[in-house]
Structures are given as C-alpha cells and as structure tokens.
UniProtKB/Swiss-Prot annotation:
This is Isoleucine--tRNA ligase. Its main location: cytoplasm. Its EC number is 6.1.1.5. Belongs to the class-I aminoacyl-tRNA synthetase family. IleS type 1 subfamily. Zn(2+) binds at C900, C903, C920, C923. ATP binds at K605. Monomer. InterPro entries: aa-tRNA-synth_I_CS, aa-tRNA-synth_Ia, Anticodon_Ile_BEm, Ile-tRNA-ligase, Ile-tRNA-ligase_type1, Ile-tRNA_ligase, M/V/L/I-tRNA-synth_anticd-bd, Rossmann-like_a/b/a_fold. A motif ('HIGH' region) lies at residues 58-68. Keywords: Aminoacyl-tRNA synthetase, ATP-binding, Cytoplasm, Ligase, Metal-binding, Nucleotide-binding, Protein biosynthesis, Zinc. It is found in: Cytoplasm. GO terms for cellular component: cytosol.
Length: 937
C-alpha cells in the first residue's frame, strides 16, 4: 500500500494547542516592556482623535484584589478597543496616596507622630510606605496585561499634583464656594477625625430604642392648644430616640407643622403624641386603656416649652419637615450638635449648637456629673438610669438597625459639631449647577443618573477639612480674632503651591507665616487642617487631565469605577469640577458591580470565599481572568468561582483552537504572492469572509457601547457556529487534499487569512496575550504589534443580488443541520462510524431542490457525505425522515464504492487508474493531474 501522506497539505504551525498562559505570558510581558510597547502605540496613534479614560486612583495600600482586577481589565479593554476604532487613547494609571489608612499602617510600624518621630519624619515614612505599596500593586496590574504609562503614573503625593490640589482649592475659594462653620459631621472616635460621606459604611447595630417624657413647663397653655382644660395630672410631650447619649445636647423638640397631634390621657398622666402613632406607642408601652382628650396641628404647639428630663433647662417646640410618621412618636429629639437635620433646624430657630463630646468620643468635663469623661456608647446605660430615676422613661426596648460606621475601623461613628471647612452646596449655587451638569452626562447603566441626582439633591455641605498629618494642607491663613481668611488668600495659596511643587507638602509645615505675610503675620495664624482625600482624587481632572500633555487639553471622555463611587469619586469630581470650571469633568460615567462568589455572597476572608487574582494568573493565566471579566454582565454583581473560571477556560480553548486552525492552515501561504481576488474565490470562501465582516460590524459596535459580554458571545458564535461547526469542517477536505498551489486551496487560504486578520483584532482588547501570540504567527509583513492596528479593513462579503447570497447559505446551514441529525442517529445505531460512510437522498420541493442542485457535485462537500442525491419531495419513501424544514425529507444509506485512503471519501472509481490503484479519481487528479476545480465549496 502506497503512502500518500506526503501528498496532503497537512496543517502545521508554531502556535501550540495548549495556551500554557501562566508560563508564557510573563515572557511576553518582558518583550512588551523591552520594546516599550506603550510608547510604540502612542507613536502609531499620534495625530488621531483622542479618547480619554481618566483612571480613578486605587488607594496605595495592600495587594490588589479581584475587584481591582475587574476594574483595571474593563478600563484596558476600553483603551485597546478605542485604539482599534482609530482613536489615540492614552492611559495614565494613578494612585491615591494620602489619608488615614496609610497613617494607621505607619503608626503600627513606627508609632504616632510626636512620640518618637516628628510630624515631618512621619510624613516622610508615609510617603515611603505609599511608594512601596504602589510598586507591589503596579507589578500585579502589569501582570494582568494592562497597558499604560507605568513609568509615569500620576500619584496624588507627587509634588506637582499636591501643588495643583492646593490650586484647585484656591479656585473654589475664588468662586465663592468655601464655607467655615461648626457643623455636625461624621466623626470617627478611633480616627479622631471627621469622615467624608464616602468613608461611611453601614452595618447592623443593636441600640436602645426609648420613648422619653418631656414635661410641659406650662400645662395650662399647652392644653389650651388642644381645646381642653389642664388636668390634675402632669402633661408631657413624648420623644423617641435610639441615641440616648445625645440627650445632654438636646436643645429642642421637633414636630411637623401639618401633622395631627393628640392629647392622650392614661393612668396618672397625659401624653402628647402624633395621632397616627398613638396606637403603636401604647402597644409597645403595654398601655391598654387611654382616652383622647383633644387634638391640634403641630404648628399650634410651636415655641411652647418643655422641661429637659435631667439637664435643668427647657426645650422649645420647633417645626421641621424631616419629622415623619414612619416610627417613633411624631416628636423628634433635636440636638443641633449631633445631626445635620437638627443643625439646619437649629440655625432656623437660633438654637445653641451644643457639643459636649470630645474628639475621643468622651463627654467633656462639666457635661453632667455622672457622665463626664465617659465614652458615649458606654454612657447609654447611664443615661437610661438617669431617665428612670427622673420618671422620664416611658418605654425601653432593643432595636437592631443599620448604623453608620467607619470604613476603616468598622466601629460606630457619631455626628459631632466641630469647626470645619466646607464646600457649600448652596452658598453660590453649586447644587443647582451640579444637577444641571448631571443631565449632560451619559450614565451607564442609565439608573446611575437618578442615583447621583438624588445624592446631590439631598447631600449636606461637603466637609473637606481633616485633622490629620498625612494629607494635602489646606494652606490657609485666618485672622486670629475674626477667623476670616486673609484678603490675599488666592495669591498666598499660589505662593504656597509653588513651594509645594518643589518640596512637597512639607513645605507648608516648614513655612514661617512672616515669609509670605510680612508684618501681617502677627495678626494671622496658619491652618494645619489637611484636605479630605476625596478632594485629592476629586481634583485630578484639573491636576492630571488638564496638566498631562498626552491629553492635549481635552476633558475626560469617561470615568469607570464601581457603583459605590456615585457617592465617592464621581461625586467629588463633579463637585470640584463644577465649582471651579462650571462643568462636569466627564462625558460618560460607567459603573460596574461588585464581585461575589458563585452563590452570590459578598467576598469575605472570614467566609473563606475570596479568590486572589494572583492565584488565578499563576494557575490559569491573565487571559482567562480577562475573558471572565469580559464575559460577565458587569452592570450587576459579578460572580466568580473556580467553576466559573473553568467555564471561561473552556471558552478560551474554543477561541484558541479556532485561531490555531486558521494559523495551521495558512502554512505555506504568503498573502502578497498567494492571495486570490474576491471574484475568483469559491463562493463559500467569500461567504465565510462575509461572515467575518458581519461579525466585525457587530463586535465593533458592541465594543463602542462597552457591551463586552456581547462581544464575547458574538466572537464565540463566530468561532463555534459559523466557523467551527460549518465552514472549517467543510474546507478540511479541500484544504488538505487539493493541490497545494491550486486555486481551490489558495482561495480557501485567502479566506482563512482575512478571517485570521480580523479575529486577532477582535481578540486583542480582551485576550491580549493570546492575540499577540497569534499576531506573531500570522504570515505576511505586518506591524510589530497588533495593538497599533485598527479593525481589519480587508473584509468583503457576498452581494445581496447573487444567486448564492447570504440567505442561500443560511438555507444550506439549516439543511446541513437536519442531515447531521440523521447521520448522528445512524452513528448511534452503529450503521456508520463517519459521515463519509454515508450517502443521503434529499427529497425537496422545487425551490429548495434548485438551490441544492446549483452546487452540483460540490453539495456532498457541504454535507460531509460521500454521495448525495436530490429528489422530488413527493417521491420520498417510508425510509425518508421528515425534517424540521417543512419542504425537506432525508433518507440515509451506506455510501457506494470503496474508501479512498487519501481523502477518506467512498467512491466507485477507486482503483480505476493503475498507477494509483488505491486512489479515487479526484485524488488522482490532485496528486498526478492538474488538480480538481471547485467553484462553490
């Protein structure tokens, strides 16, 4: 028996079947950075229209987690896909470097400033620590395949950036948005500092829920409002609170002007309660019998006075819209120093802003004898005892509720009135302007707009001052007596900024006031407050986007972060940009959800369900992680588990195998020498290129809409359905058995080449390492890297007016699917082992029969059978099976003739040529003749 193996065009490629990504990717990275790939891309894209994604800076503390990976991979996909779409899309990664978490870490290492180290030395240690953390995170981000200017990232602790943060504050002051006041702010007693809204998390906490009597000072006057005479018993207004420790700071009781209040008589006393809440109060207090003596509107009780249960002063009734009927008594204990609503109401009525609590959360001396020096949360029980002793406690129970906690310490926080600096929301119209700007931004998903609008509508003034060591100084001078800002504040801040640009933030603490103020220094003091870290990152649209030459003075096109950043970075950036520029800092805002495990649970070290991106990369490779991110609908929760990653690895293999098939069958193909003109190609080959053209249009559109999971689905459909289960199956015969330089084979290779050129570009934004690998195996002259390219422009398709147009091949796909069902059953019944052992008869109506017959003898190649006959639908016998195509029945039988050992087809003409006695006539033509001709498939 002769060996005809060397007459076949067997596939061959250096592109391995196994990705072995964990080992191969690090070597690719070395080449990328040796070649300075990021700069290569910048040079290639120079002069193109810019697309700017501004990186929200991660905090420079700790290793990156799976959420960081999601965020950075999504950004990288956008950057790379925009490059493919013809944009110059630079990426400047950044880090948030100041703030409390780093201070706490450094305190653990060297102690608090002032103990063994000066504040200046402490800041230097903080800077050093942040730098070390950045290097660790940077290494992991690079390992993910994220391309960016890693040699020149932006850091909020860069001297120039620190100076520009100070300049941003000066512009806010110049535009009239800065406000100073003793307002209640979120205060962490562990941090001993105010917290921003974004630094507050909510956890369940059990608190005492109490109803407290405030006895009427003038019961006669009170009862008159209810239209009744004063009874003999005491009359009290009942308030409800879950923070007994705030009662020493009570200065009023708030009612709603329009609510109906009732004077209710119970055994031994009369109570004033909101009419709608009387029953619930009585029920929880265990009171079964009561009589309503009278009623009046809340407004009728305004400014009537009630005795504080134990502080020895009176509390007036004030009216506030924040009073609700959701719970409680309809009367709200009001402590202007311990709550924003209380503060606003207190301002309206001129109430004292009492703050009896120190920075450590303990009562100040002189508050109340048994409370002085006690921590507020421990004081709750003492306050309850005092209330009981004074017969003021109507009812006590425990309530589990959501309570604000410090994001760092996870401990409950308090509202505490302290002198602070604020960006005012209403002093100069910032709230109104911000709400207007929100409307001009595209929010993805769309619900983001309503969310941030609600936040802006309801947010208090932004407290931007902090009493910390490691942060950008506010750089302000205030008058010793009036506490007014220096009249030359803007000019002075610029002088400070110039010094900070040279020496960093330490320049402010080293500065002697006289150096800038001269004789004025005697009347002014330096403010040592630092800026909220959210001010640092929120001003990077000015300190980074406006300043870096790569961005060419353009505003950011998109901000992309987790959905928690509506109240964080998106908010602070919007506030600062609107305050200094009068416009939003972004055109689009895209948010992604948080990572959860396969059961939808939040990632937690205590549960043990965390997945480390480093472990995934070491085991599976970064491209699997990237494909998982791209495959997920990131607008909701993003599930990850070993099983989910395994599915991503399976999907990866299908894409890799498609790429490998293309490359292996381009062996010996030079696009410059061997490409076939479209009009000379087999129709099926042109159809396949047209499929790629349609897929590319869909994929490019989805990339543009940031719809990456649909990109992956479309790519998988193309690889698995249009190519894998149809086209690539069909062409194997022609590719392997036709003469190597025949038109039939070169037509096929031309199609494969165009498809590979397109596919590698679709892959590049997501499967960056694999795309680079494919790119280096593709034949022909090309740029060094796929990342400098644009969507492939060499695709073409079938004309709609052609007989064998896309609709024709869609029908053929359907017919082949029905034939496959019959052959699968025959295989299951052990009638055949391979479809080439089969002959099929297709009984079709005239319209379908004409289509099938138009392919002539090449129909068998489309169906992967050795023989096929097309017959009239009405002639079908009982052996023919009705298909799901109404006009088609299919009959199966074993193929006639013998098996050709070269092409494996069964044919009657095997052995008719003596010199090649084992071959079919077609193979003889391909081996010893001019080669077969293929017009269609």
């Amino acid at each position: 028996m002769s060996d005809y193996k060397n007459t076949l065009n067997l596939p061959e490629t250096g592109f391995p079947m196994r990705g072995d990504l964990a080992k191969r990717e690090p070597n690719m990275l070395k080449r990328w950075y040796k070649d300075e790939l990021y700069q290569v891309i910048r040079k290639a894209k120079a002069g193109k229209k810019t697309f700017i994604l501004h990186d929200g800076p991660p905090y420079a503390n700790g290793s990156i987690h799976i959420g960081h990976s999601v965020n950075k991979i999504l950004k990288d996909i956008i950057i790379k896909s925009k490059g493919m779409a013809g944009y110059d899309s630079p990426y400047i990664p950044g880090w948030d470097c100041h703030g409390l978490p780093i201070e706490l870490k450094v305190e653990q290492i060297i102690g608090k400033p002032g103990e063994k180290f000066s504040a200046a030395e402490f800041r230097a240690e903080c800077r050093k620590y942040a730098k070390e953390q950045i290097e660790g995170q940077k290494k992991d981000f690079i390992r993910l395949g994220i391309l960016g200017d890693w040699e020149r990232p932006y850091l909020t602790m860069d001297f120039k950036t620190e100076a520009d943060i100070i300049r941003a504050l000066s512009r806010i002051i110049a535009n009239g948005h800065l406000l100073k006041g003793a307002k209640p702010v979120h205060w962490c007693t562990d941090c001993r500092s105010s917290l921003a809204e974004a630094e507050v998390e909510y956890y369940d906490k059990t608190s005492p829920s109490i109803d407290v009597r405030f006895n009427a000072v003038d019961a006669v006057a009170v009862c008159e409002k209810f239209g009744v005479q004063a009874p003999e018993q005491p009359v009290s207004l009942v308030i409800w609170t879950t923070t007994p420790w705030t009662l020493p700071a009570n200065r009023a009781i708030a009612l709603h002007a329009e609510f109906n209040y009732q004077l209710v008589q119970i055994e031994g006393e009369c109570l004033i309660l909101a009419a709608d809440l009387v029953e619930s109060v009585m029920q929880r207090a265990g009171i079964t019998s009561w009589t309503v003596l009278g009623h009046c509107a809340g407004s009728a009780l305004e400014l009537l006075r009630f005795k504080h249960p134990f502080m020895g002063f009176d509390s007036p009734v004030v009216l506030g819209d924040h009073v609700t009927l959701d719970a409680g008594t309809g009367a709200v204990h009001t402590a202007p120093g311990h709550g924003p609503d209380d503060f606003v109401l207190g301002q309206k009525y001129g109430l004292e802003v009492a703050n009896p609590v120190g920075p450590n959360g303990c009562y100040l001396p002189g508050t109340y004898p048994s409370l002085d020096g006690m921590f507020v949360f421990k004081a709750n029980d003492v306050v309850l005892n005092i209330l009981s002793e004074n017969n003021a406690l109507l009812h006590l129970e425990k309530l589990q509720h959501s309570y604000p906690c410090c994001w760092r310490h996870k401990t409950p926080i308090i509202f505490r009135a302290t002198p602070q600096w604020f960006v005012s929301m209403d002093q100069n119209g910032l709230r109104k302007q911000s709400l207007q700007e929100i409307k001009g931004v595209q929010w993805i998903p769309g619900w983001g707009q309503a969310r941030i609008e609600a936040m802006v509508e309801n947010r208090p003034d932004w407290c931007i001052s902090r009493q910390r060591t490691w942060g950008t100084p506010m750089s302000l001078f205030v008058h010793k007596e009036t506490e007014e800002l220096h009249p030359r504040t803007i000019e002075l801040m610029e002088e400070v900024a110039k010094r900070v640009e040279v020496d960093g933030i330490q320049a402010w603490w080293d500065l002697e006031p006289a150096e800038l103020l001269g004789d004025d220094a005697a009347n002014y003091v330096k403010i040592f407050d630092t800026l909220d870290v959210w001010f640092d990152s929120g001003s990077t649209h000015a300190s980074v986007v406006d300043a870096r030459p790569e961005f060419q003075g353009n505003a950011a096109d998109i901000y992309l972060e987790g959905s928690d950043q509506h109240r964080g970075w998106f908010m602070s950036s919007l506030m600062i940009s609107t305050a200094i520029k009068g416009k939003a800092p972004y055109r689009q805002v895209l948010t992604h959800g948080f990572t959860v495990d396969g059961q939808g649970r939040k990632m937690s070290k205590s549960i043990g369900n965390t997945i480390s991106p480093q472990d995934v990369m070491d085991k599976l490779g970064a491209d699997i992680l990237r494909l998982w991110v791209a495959s997920t609908d990131y607008t909701g929760e993003i599930a990850v588990s070993d099983e989910i990653l395994k599915r991503s690895a399976d999907a990866y293999r299908r894409i890799r195998n498609t790429a490998r098939f293309l490359l292996a069958n381009l062996n010996g193909f030079d696009p410059e020498q061997h490409s076939v003109k479209p009009e000379e190609m087999a129709v099926l080959d042109r159809w396949a290129v047209g499929c790629a053209q349609a897929a590319q249009a869909d994929i490019a559109k989805c990339y543009d809409k940031y719809d990456f999971h649909t990109v992956v689905q479309r790519m998988m459909q193309f690889c698995s359905v249009e190519m894998g289960s149809f086209y690539l199956d069909i062409i194997k015969d022609r590719q392997y058995t036709a003469k190597s330089d025949s038109l039939a084979r070169r037509s096929c290779q031309t199609a494969l080449y165009h498809i590979a050129e397109a596919l590698v570009r679709w892959m590049a934004p997501i499967l960056s390492f694999t795309a680079d690998e494919v790119w280096n195996e593709l034949p022909g002259k090309r740029a060094q890297y796929v990342f400098t390219e644009e969507w492939y422009g060499g695709l073409f398709g079938l004309a709609a007016g052609e007989l064998m147009n896309d609709a024709f091949w869609a029908d053929l796909l359907a017919v082949r699917g029905e034939v496959n069902k019959v052959l699968e059953q025959a295989r299951a019944d052990k009638h055949i082992r391979s479809s080439l052992e089969a002959a099929v008869t297709l009984y079709a109506d005239n319209e379908l029969a004409d289509k099938l017959n138009s392919l002539g003898d090449e129909l068998r190649f489309v169906l992967l059978t050795s023989q096929v006959v097309v017959a009239d639908y009405e002639q079908a016998g009982e052996d023919a099976q009705q298909s799901e195509i109404g006009s088609l029945k299919i009959a199966f039988r074993k193929a006639d003739g013998e098996k050709c050992p070269r092409c494996w087809h069964y044919a009657k003409d095997v052995g008719l040529v003596a010199e090649h006695a084992e071959l079919c006539g077609r193979c003889v033509t391909n081996v010893a003749g001019n080669g077969e001709e293929r017009k269609f498939a």
